[in-house]
């Protein structure tokens, strides 16, 4: 049982006997946890890395604030330029039609060409 009043030197000695290493990460000033809808930012962070049985655990102390994420605009799908050119040449279609066909075929050039040829 750990006594109620233990100084830091005794605590470090006891942790060392148990195979637990504790390291202060003095060069860390900010920690950011990225979530799906918001980020959690911890400013003026004091970070301690605790290693026990090969597992590293981090203790973070500081001032936390939540930063909501703005909804991202839907990114335009991009396909390799070679695939676009191949579909354009083989199906004799414009670049726009080739890209539409690649979208419809899940990015598969052969399927895109076959779909265009059947029309």
UniProtKB/Swiss-Prot annotation:
Tree of life domain: Archaea
Keywords assigned by UniProt, alphabetized: Protein transport, RNA-binding, Transport
Decide whether keyword Protein transport is in the record: yes
Q: Which GO terms describe its molecular function?
A: RNA binding
Q: Which residues form the NAC-A/B domain?
A: 5-73
PROSITE patterns the UniProt entry points to:
NAC_AB
Q: Name one GO biological process term.
A: protein transport
The record's note on quaternary structure and interaction partners says: Homodimer. Interacts with the ribosome. Binds ribosomal RNA.
What family is this protein classified in? Belongs to the NAC-alpha family.
Q: NCBIfam families of this UniProt entry?
A: archaeal-type nascent polypeptide-associated complex protein
Question: Could you tell me what this protein is called?
Answer: Nascent polypeptide-associated complex protein
Source organism (scientific name): Thermoplasma acidophilum (strain ATCC 25905 / DSM 1728 / JCM 9062 / NBRC 15155 / AMRC-C165)
Gene of this entry: nac
């Amino acid at each position: 049982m750990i006594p109620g009043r233990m100084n830091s030197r005794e605590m470090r000695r006891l942790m060392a006997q148990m195979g637990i290493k504790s390291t202060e990460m003095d060069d860390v000033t900010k920690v950011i946890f990225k979530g799906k809808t918001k980020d959690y930012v911890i400013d003026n962070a004091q970070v301690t890395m605790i290693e026990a049985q090969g597992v590293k655990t981090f203790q973070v102390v500081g001032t936390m604030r939540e930063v909501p994420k703005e909804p991202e605009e839907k990114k335009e799908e991009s396909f390799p330029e070679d695939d676009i050119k191949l579909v354009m040449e083989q199906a004799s279609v414009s670049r726009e039609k080739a890209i539409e066909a690649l979208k419809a075929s899940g990015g598969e050039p052969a399927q895109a060409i076959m779909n265009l040829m059947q029309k």
